[in-house]
């Protein structure tokens, strides 16, 4: 087994989000970010903040701009992208009707969705205490393949891990395999998963996945992230940090 090295991480130290690592996506997006979500994403400390080395992403019931809810969505798109490796994050999720937290990845931004590829390390919804792990890509239309976990208490911290190489994408919960997909030689038109991806966290309110029947009495709700770390095989360096290309030839 090849030795792995840490290439990027955020331990969420300090008092504010590290904008050398993350960008906040703001607004309601086109057609509710393509999912008919109901929230307005902000960069306010009411919706995203760090306390005791924990990242908090909070969905709130409030009238803001033209929406009835606010939350936050962050991405490494402008700061860090990588191809292949291991991602680990220690996360606690909220449960509430109409809530949709996610830790996920998007691929090549020169392509529209689903051509760019999407890897959902975790999604959950409503009061379902289980994890949805999925991949989405283009194969004569939208192709989706995934798996739903057995019951786990998602409100407790669990380590969610992605292992990604030229042959497989595998997703683990506390080191137990939850999902895998074969991508070698672009099997099933999975060529999207051989490009560079970024990391994303968000908590949506409503939308196609959880539905729009929101339990306002249960809000606010928070996703908590203890850390996120990315490893690659020693010497590979298939990543981009702050637009500096370390290796773009594999």
Q: Where do the PLM segments sit?
A:
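GH16 jelly-roll
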Residues: 1-250
């Amino acid at each position: 087994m090849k030795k792995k090295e840490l290439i990027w991480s955020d331990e969420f130290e300090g008092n504010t989000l590290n904008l050398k690592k993350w960008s906040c996506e703001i607004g309601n997006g086109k057609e509710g970010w393509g999912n008919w979500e109901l929230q307005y994403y902000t960069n306010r400390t009411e919706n995203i903040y760090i306390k005791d080395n924990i990242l908090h992403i909070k969905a709130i019931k409030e009238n803001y701009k033209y929406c009835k809810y606010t939350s936050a969505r962050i991405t490494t798109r402008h700061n860090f992208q990588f191809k292949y490796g291991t991602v680990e994050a220690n996360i606690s999720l909220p449960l509430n009707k109409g809530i949709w937290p996610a830790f996920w990845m998007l691929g090549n931004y020169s392509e529209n969705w689903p051509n760019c590829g999407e890897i959902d390390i975790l999604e959950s919804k409503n009061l379902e205490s289980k994890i949805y792990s999925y991949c989405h890509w283009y194969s004569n239309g939208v192709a989706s393949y995934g798996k739903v976990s057995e019951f786990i208490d998602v409100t407790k911290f669990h380590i969610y891990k992605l292992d990604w190489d030229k042959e497989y994408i595998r997703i683990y919960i506390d080191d137990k395999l939850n999902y895998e997909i074969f991508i070698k030689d672009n099997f099933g038109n999975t060529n999207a998963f051989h490009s560079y991806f970024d990391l994303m966290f968000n908590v949506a309110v409503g939308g196609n996945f959880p539905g729009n029947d929101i339990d306002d009495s249960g809000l606010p709700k928070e996703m908590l992230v203890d850390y996120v770390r990315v490893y690659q095989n020693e010497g590979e360096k298939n990543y981009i940090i702050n637009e500096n290309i370390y290796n773009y030839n594999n």
